[in-house]
Amino acid sequence: MSPFSLLILVICAFSLFFLINLSRGLSILLVFTKNQLLALLLLSIVSLFSISLISALIFFDLLPSTFFGFILLLFF
């Protein structure tokens, strides 16, 4: 594993931890707020952002490997 891959995994882990804590706080906000539509919108944006960030980091980490190319050949 290269140092760049390790750095990407560390950034991914910390960003996932941060976004999970943020979404937990937003779900608590959803319970106690009067404008629930805005809180629900914020919660969905944070969730979609975290999923897309993790997917992109995994994709770019696996892109150079030959195993990933083999998987692409199998599914496409």
Curated annotation (Swiss-Prot):
It is found in: Membrane. Keywords: Membrane, Signal, Transmembrane, Transmembrane helix. The keyword Membrane applies. It is a single-pass type I membrane protein. One of its GO terms (cellular component) is membrane. Residues 26-34 are extracellular. Residues 56-76 are cytoplasmic. It comes from the Eukaryota. Residues 1-25 form the signal peptide. Its main location: membrane. Disruption phenotype: Homozygous mice have tremors and a propensity to develop spastic movements upon handling. The chain crosses the membrane at residues 35-55. This is KANTR integral membrane protein. It comes from Mus musculus.
